[in-house]
Amino acid sequence: MPSSAVMTTASTDGYIGWGENDLDTKVDPKKILQGDQLAGGRLIRLLEEDAPEGIAGFKAIFSHTGNAFILGITGPPGSGKSTLVAHIIAEFRRRNLKVGVVAVDPSSPLSGGAFLGDRLRMRQHTEDDGVFIRSMATRGHLGGLSRTTREAVMVLDAMGYDVVIIETVGVGQDEVEIADFAHTTAIVSIPGLGDDIQTMKAGLLEIGDVFVVNKADRRGSDDEVARLQSMLEMGMIPENDWKPPVLNTVAIKGKGIAELVDAVWSHRQYLMDSGQFKAHNRAQTFRFVRSLVMEMAADKIFENAKDSAAYQTLLGNLDKRKIDPFTAAEKLLKGL
């Protein structure tokens, strides 16, 4: 294992990733931009902690972001996403591309950390200094993606990873958030879902750029492919030149992986040729700024108001139902 790569299989809060046991708060932007995994892992940890050193480090590296291709992978629990990702990493490495992974898990109700689960299957890549894997908890964003996920992706981008994969468990409405982060979104399904696939949200079908039927050696895989293709054709956007492919894979045997990566890379090329790659980056950055403004403004408003008599009166009136939440929010925005 390279000296810069420090990986723990299970720290006290349940994470896996590089730099987890490093408690130093010193951030070295130069090392991060050189791809130092310990320095990068440290910055991600500090950003998770909302530490001033982390924010300062992020500011120092931001101008070096916007180059990585971001691939989002989502799907129901048990669909073999982590095994699929492990083989996708290997295929990208065969093509001499550096790969970063942010694996998003639901937060543990006891520790707030990320569940290890099948992520240990990715450990085969931990001795490769061209791969960086970070498992992160959603911290209250069940099935969705927290602010620190976005920050971690940008850190890996600045570190020089050609591809950054976001893997998230596909549960709840927030699973569509992955399209806000990723240039290309791969939706993973498996045979045997039966009528459940019919209830798949239209929004999820709309965000998918590539559809994968994993565990295709099971009975019903051809039916699953046909069903997905039919649903996609019915919901096809006429002006969209990209036609999402539906591919079969057997991840545990490594079958169909090269074809999947080919399809993903074809979508990347489509985005580059159409100008949508840069447009996505602009939109994603604006969404990030908007979320920060909302967060910072709310913090500032409540910090300024919390000790005032007017704020206590407002809380009392709200509790007694003398005013409604909308009116209370309007008063806070106006400075009470």
Language model regions located:
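Canonical P-loop GTPase G-domain recognition
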Residues: A216-Y270
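Hydrophobic positions on the alpha1 helix immediately C-terminal to the Walker A/P-loop
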Residues: L84
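Low-acidity, Ser/Thr- and Arg-rich intrinsically disordered low-complexity segments
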Residues: S3-S4, S11
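Conserved C-terminal guanine-recognition region of P-loop GTPase G domains, centered on the G4
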Residues: G172-A182, S189-E239
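Long, well-ordered amphipathic alpha-helical subdomains in the mid-to-C-terminal portions
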Residues: N248, E259-L336
